[in-house]
């Protein structure tokens, strides 16, 4: 199954999962509610949030992978944080929420999705950081994941 999925479909799933995880961290809504918002086109209550662009409307998105990443990170975020903590140079609560979402997403893929090579996980996280995080966040994300990879994944 994994071999037949196009890389672009996985890339889109990661992008939307990152955005959903970030939203979940900010709003503290039930993860099922966040998932539904993304699956239904990203519509938010406009009185409380800005209208979002339709999330999973892109034709090439691996929706099953999106769901796995989103729910997996939400259900295991404390465990993921404890795996990340030794490799992060500052307290976890001081991380930018986008950096935290990126690191959690990548750590989930490294520890739970062994069908995805760790180098792909790191590269995808770097590319997402370049698009969604602060200017030099991709360097920080790369450093953390490079240090963590040998400890959480057999090369």
Curated annotation (Swiss-Prot):
It holds the Pfam family NusB. Coiled coil: none annotated. One of its GO terms (cellular component) is cytosol. GO terms for biological process: DNA-templated transcription termination; transcription antitermination. One of its GO terms (molecular function) is RNA binding. Keywords: RNA-binding, Transcription, Transcription antitermination, Transcription regulation. Involved in transcription antitermination. Required for transcription of ribosomal RNA (rRNA) genes. Binds specifically to the boxA antiterminator sequence of the ribosomal RNA (rrn) operons. Belongs to the NusB family. HAMAP family: NusB (MF_00073). This is Transcription antitermination protein NusB.
């Amino acid at each position: 199954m994994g071999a037949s999925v196009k890389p672009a479909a996985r890339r889109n799933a990661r992008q939307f999962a990152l955005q959903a995880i970030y939203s979940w961290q900010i709003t503290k809504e039930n993860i099922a509610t966040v998932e539904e918002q993304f699956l239904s086109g990203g519509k938010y209550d406009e009185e409380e949030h800005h209208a979002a662009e339709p999330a999973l409307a892109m034709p090439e998105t691996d929706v099953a992978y999106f769901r796995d990443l989103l729910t997996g990170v939400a259900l295991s975020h404390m465990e993921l944080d404890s795996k990340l903590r030794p490799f992060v140079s500052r307290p976890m609560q001081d991380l930018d929420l986008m950096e935290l979402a990126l690191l959690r997403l990548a750590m989930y893929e490294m520890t739970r999705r062994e069908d995805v090579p760790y180098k792909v996980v790191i590269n995808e996280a770097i590319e997402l950081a370049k698009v969604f995080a602060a200017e030099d966040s991709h360097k920080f994300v790369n450093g953390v994941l490079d240090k963590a990879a040998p400890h959480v994944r057999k090369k």
